Amino acid sequence: MKNENNISLPQYVTLNIQTLNSSEDKTIRIKAKTLNFPLSSEDLRDISILEKKYDQEENCAGLAAPQIGISKCIIIFAVHEDAELKKWHPDLKDTMPKTIWINPSYKPIGIDKHEDYEGCFSVENATGPVARFKKIHYHAYDINGNQIQGIAEGFLARVIQHEIDHLNGKVFLDYVAPKKIMTKEEYLEMRKKAMEQENIKS
């Protein structure tokens, strides 16, 4: 696949849903490399590729470099105020414009968790409920090596935790009991029925 600048973009590294491993590329299941500053020209090229891959997607909360075969601690994500998104994720509170983080990490604030359904480009046509910390303190660097830190709550905290998991060789299905895994079609049907019930009650 090529973008408007004729730069070839890599395909996603996908996992076999039964084994949760990839026979083609181990990048998605190993700890990614921590980057040093100043970033090399190769690092900057990889960041550009990741951003272009992200920009071509619709309804994409975030991507991590290992998802496209780049074993480096780079993530890109965005969470905007959106009424439709809030229907699916009522805990949407904090927002953040499109952001690229290098070497990100987080620490939970408290022990409270919230369960919600997640999906991933690296696990095709599968979703399941994942309990994530409701509130976290994050730390990262921008591409110039400037420190970034702050507090995230709700859906934004979930997105950050999900993407950082990729840098540690984890995917969301690692936290989901096999019997709770469903296809996206099954999930959408479940949500449709739930919303219909809510409309009846109101």
From Swiss-Prot:
For this protein, the Enzyme Commission number is: 3.5.1.88
Q: Which family, according to UniProt?
A: Belongs to the polypeptide deformylase family.
Q: What does this protein do?
A: Removes the formyl group from the N-terminal Met of newly synthesized proteins. Requires at least a dipeptide for an efficient rate of reaction. N-terminal L-methionine is a prerequisite for activity but the enzyme has broad specificity at other positions.
Catalytic reactions of this protein:
N-terminal N-formyl-L-methionyl-[peptide] + H2O = N-terminal L-methionyl-[peptide] + formate
Q: For Fe cation, which residues are the binding ones?
A: 120, 162, 166
Protein name stated in the entry: Peptide deformylase 2
What gene name is given for the protein in this entry?
Answer: def2
Co-factor note (free text):
Binds 1 Fe(2+) ion.
Keywords, in A-Z order: Hydrolase, Iron, Metal-binding, Protein biosynthesis
Which is a GO BP term held by this UniProt record? translation
